[in-house]
Amino acid sequence: MTESAAPWRRVLAYWWYAWGLSWCYWGIRWANQSYFRSGIRSFDRAIRLWPQFSRGFYRRGLIRGRELNDHAAGIADMDRAIALAPEWPDPYLQRGLFQRFHGDQRAALADLRRYLALAHDPTWRAEAERQIAMIQAELGEEEVGTLER
């Protein structure tokens, strides 16, 4: 995470980030998308205060892609989080999952493999490995189908 913003801006950005997390908690608790949209606005404020705040982009992308079904925006936010913190594994996992279910299987495969190269969390590693195996099986079937034509 780049520390280029003034300390007071980073503190205020973390405050807005925490406020956004609280909105998202209530969105999950009450299954109400308006809370998620309020969380997004809080993450937007955090990012405006500290444009290099990779966690702000990550969390905003997670909520956009997973809770608000705006997968393209979620992937774009993960792209930005990765650009800011390329050795942080979590955005690779989430972007890979978004791509897996809403986009490009080959890009998903690359992201999930990158996640495995960086991550140490056994729970999510197992999920990434499972998704990779399923993508490889699906791509293998597609390639066999293409060759038969």
Task: Kindly give the residue locations of the regions a language model identified.
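Structural signature of tandem alpha-helical TPR/SEL1-like repeats
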Residues: 30-42, 68-80, 102-114, 125
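Residue-level recognition of tetratricopeptide repeat
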Residues: 21, 28, 62-63, 97, ...
